[in-house]
UniProtKB/Swiss-Prot annotation:
Pathway in which the depicted protein is active: Carbohydrate degradation; glycolysis; pyruvate from D-glyceraldehyde 3-phosphate: step 4/5
InterPro entries hit by this protein: Enolase (IPR000941), Enolase-like_C_sf (IPR036849), Enolase-like_N (IPR029017), Enolase_C (IPR020810), Enolase_CS (IPR020809), Enolase_N (IPR020811)
SMART domains according to UniProt: Enolase_C, Enolase_N
Record keywords, A-Z: Cytoplasm, Glycolysis, Lyase, Magnesium, Metal-binding, Secreted
Subcellular location: Cytoplasm; Secreted; Cell surface
Name by which UniProt lists this protein: Enolase
Length: 424
């Protein structure tokens, strides 16, 4: 029987949803089967993320070109991967990590390595005639994730004065992924009408949520609660709220304060918001270096709500293990491009789950039409996904893919709709 191996890798520079370059990669086997992947890019990034290689040539794309990463795919990764079994994902990824030889993939670029890693896995799935989620997750892949929908954008995702980066809804009362998407869409359109009535802008931010000029984080939360009610749902019962504070973006490392507030005061602000609003998840409520603050936040709120580490962990198994040992957070945001390979992404998720931490598969603010994260959320049974609002086709593509997976799974599929920290 002919062994199926990597025979060619193609790559090209494409544009993401913000109009900046990113990589498209195609891995082709000796039997003609292939897999394709487009690499996302973040605006709000953790300092310990794997390096996204950019050209720094200011004469094109404001220095954000990825021609060097593209060159690395063709001239470095292709030669070392030709002839490698398409089904040996661990070997494929380890060869690339070794070829790079740096702790944060700065030599070849995490964007180059991830593109090849994902495209190779998709080529393997195509060779077997399987859906990508089924190839990666096997027979255990069956949980449809509850979406965390970013309806109001702030922080580094919008230029509107809001301190926090994402104000999200979670359709926890839905009984299926399709129903969850419908509920989110109803609230999204209701919110747009509310903004129009208040003569507020209805332009959207990077992730498809609205970016109105508001005076405070509380005003954004008030609008979401009102939109939920006007759409015919019960806040906290059918639809809950979630925050991504992206606190590192407003943390002063010299004074160790958050807009003038110390860590304990910042935790107090978040606790007060949880008392006043049906919030059941807070991401990056403290800065990534503020371990003492994270301990306070987890102790204060961690028994009742999800405390999510993004910049804190950057999908890195070593950092996740360190955080677990210190009792920081109780959930991990998973972004494959933060670590750079499918194998390491899998390791991060398995480690988190083994220690009772929940996981959330996440997009980036710079996305493409690639729907990989939808399949990965089901493959790894994360139970939750962040893939933006109910607008912009690069966000909607993921929801549409999830609904297709739900239909394919049929009675085998289970929609994950509860907060694991609520005691329900």
């Amino acid at each position: 029987m002919l062994e199926v191996v990597i025979s060619d890798i193609q790559a090209r520079e494409i544009l993401d949803s913000r109009g900046y370059p990113t990589l498209y990669v195609k891995v082709i086997t000796n039997t003609g089967t292939f897999g394709e992947a487009c690499v996302p890019s973040g605006a709000s990034t953790g300092i310990k993320e794997a390096l996204e290689l950019r050209d720094q040539d200011t004469s094109r794309y404001q220095g954000k070109g990825v021609l060097q990463a593209l060159k690395n795919v063709k001239e470095v990764l292709l030669p070392v991967l030709q002839g490698v079994s398409i089904f040996d994902q661990i070997l494929i990824d380890s060869i690339m990590v070794e070829a790079d030889g740096t702790p944060n993939k700065e030599k070849l670029g995490a964007n180059a390595i991830l593109g090849v890693s994902l495209a190779a896995a998709k080529a393997a799935a195509a060779t077997l005639g399987r859906s990508f989620y089924r190839y990666v997750g096997g027979c255990f892949a069956h949980i449809l994730p509850c979406p965390m929908m970013n309806l109001i954008n702030g922080g580094m995702h919008a230029n509107n004065g809001l301190q926090f980066q994402e104000f999200m809804i979670r359709p926890i009362g839905a009984h299926s992924l399709q129903e969850a998407v419908r509920m989110g869409a109803d609230v999204f359109h209701t919110l747009k009408n509310l903004l129009n009535d208040k003569h507020l802008a209805t332009g959207v931010g990077d992730e498809g949520g609205f970016a109105p000029q508001l005076k405070s984080n509380s005003e954004a939360l008030d609008l979401l609660v009102l939109a939920i009610e006007k759409a015919g749902f019960q806040p906290g019962e059918e639809i809950s709220l979630a925050l991504d504070c992206a606190a590192s973006s407003f943390y002063d490392t010299k004074t160790e304060t958050y807009a003038g507030k110390n860590s304990q005061e910042q935790v107090g602000i978040l606790a007060d918001l949880c008392d006043r609003y049906p919030i059941d998840s807070i991401e990056d409520g403290l800065a990534e270096e503020d371990f003492d603050g994270w301990e306070l936040l987890t102790a204060e709120l961690g028994e009742n709500i999800q405390i999510v580490g993004d910049d804190l962990f950057v999908t890195n198994p070593e950092l996740i293990a360190e955080g677990i040992s210190k009792g920081l957070a109780n959930a991990v945001l998973i972004k494959p491009n933060q670590i750079g390979t499918l194998t390491e992404t899998s390791e991060a998720i398995q480690l988190a789950h083994s220690q009772g931490y929940t996981t959330i598969l996440s997009h980036r603010s710079g996305e493409t039409e690639d729907t990989t994260i939808a399949d990965l959320a089901v493959a790894f049974n994360t139970g939750q996904i962040k893939t933006g609002s109910l607008s912009r086709s690069e966000r909607i593509a993921k929801y549409n893919r999830l609904m297709a997976i739900e239909e394919e799974l049929g009675s085998e599929g289970l929609f994950k709709d509860s907060n694991p920290f609520s005691g329900e």
